Amino acid sequence: MILVFGGTTEGRIAIDTLSEGGKPFYYSTRGEQQKVEEPLVQRITGAMDAPTIEEFCRTHEIRLIIDAAHPFAQELHRNIGVASLSLGIPVIRLERNYPPHAQDITYCSSYEEAVDRMLADGVRHLLALTGTQTIGKLRRFWQQRKTTFRILSRQESLDIACKEGFPEQQLIFYTPEEEEDAPISRIHPDAIITKESGESGGFLEKIEAARRAGLRIYVVVRPPLPPHFHLVEGQHGLYRMVRRYIPDYFPLKRGYTTGTCATVTAKAALMALLYESEEQEVEVALPDGEIITLSIESIERLSPTKARATIRKDAGDDPDVIHGHIIAATVELVAGDELRFLQGEGVGVVTLPGLGLPIGSPAINATPRSTITQELRALYPEGGIDVTISIPDGAALAAKTFNPRLGIVGGLSIIGTSGIVKPFSHEAFVDSLRKECSVAFALSPSRLVMNSGAKSEAYIKALYPQLPPQAFVHYGNFIGDALSIAQEMHFASVSLGIMVGKAVKLAEGNLDTHSKKVVMNKDFLHKVAYEVGTSSDTHALIDELTMARELWGIPSIQERDCLLLALLQRCHSVTASQLSPNTPIVLHLISEGGETILSYPEKI
């Protein structure tokens, strides 16, 4: 088992990451303020000292500890360190991103030092953003100079302030919807003090507000961690470290997007030109800022101004057609100041609108273009750069993808919004669906036709012969996501083809019909059957159902169609509620062989 200490944004990252493993784990917080609904989480609350942590780990066979607690939870970090050393359990510290130190900020190693510096600097009115637990630590200052403390609006915080003897009239309350400038403009301090709480703790917002007001800024730096903690940043860093200590924790292995691979090779090629080096491993930032390191397959200097680097795509356990194939980047320094993306072998050409890319340009999506640009401009801020991404096997592999129906011809796309491939992930599917819908809207804004897959699409296309092929998209199990995208893009109307297995689940209100999330509910089927007055024979058949498609075998065609139409009407109510009243939707229920189709409403 794994024990996580959370209660923070990083705690939620740990929950999301570990849930991918499909195994239960313990999640410890001091209080109950953080709401956690993940079914795999076994929640424990209350402060834990070192002996308590040690006993818990022994009793519950803990193999790994993840410290995702607040950076200033110094006592907890120390207790985790003592217990983990005693038991020989490894500790992963999930760290925040911390901005580099700035010259206009006074950094202090302790609250004592901060008080000394602020008194010496002549601070007259201090806005303290360090929390109620620090009122006592700043006592020496607020007993001499005017101080306003911003605290959480809860009784526990008020009790602490009262216990410390801090004047209640000099308290203000934090509200999430209020901008950081607001308290400054109300009380007019000449300085603020805050903790080095990192980007997820709102540190930058506080600093920028103080800068705009021209205030002195004092920051108490985060305390050191036990030296045996293994520090990681971000979800992927945590994923990799958990795999290191518990190799079988995640059933499926993550990989990297084509966009990440292209970014790494482009950076490696430019480094070869600028530094005349052939780096075997290259660091790049993922779109969320997390730093990762990937191994390069080869680097070649083609001329003093041109170099090429390659990487072998690792998609993990995702069924990616490009897994194991080469992705290359050629970088050339040219005249001018522009960074250009040129057409490369095996990368598709955009031929249809809707993808957010110019027609005729290489199919390199916005996020990879951004990450490549950021990495290259960090090394070479000024001057022209031509970047050519290529996939030697791309043209042949593209035939196995949806690229042709997206209007991308001659090769594959360089894609990826997170930089990481999660096998069979919801995120990847919805991202692909969004691209298909974008092209569909560009070519057919009047109607989007959604189907669960190729089988139902083949049947339903006959109903809409006037529509281009791109107007038909697959929703898989994610009906709710597909409808949200349709609403977001303002299609004039929507048609949804569905087979009876998914229809039974959707009719009950389940917008995600995956078998892991919901199964056929016979009690619900009986309820609908009673409402439409079916015979005892139909109820007996429902009792014996193994698969919902067996409903097509109801002996009475009249009863069958009456029951199925009632289910379809319920499906319509569920789906229509996800769209605006001005966006009509029609549903088509398709039999297993495609020979019978029920529609509701019949016309829109």
Explain the meaning of each model-derived region.
Residues 26-48, 103-106, 158-164, 291-295:
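N-terminal beta-loop-helix "entrance" segment that forms/cooperates
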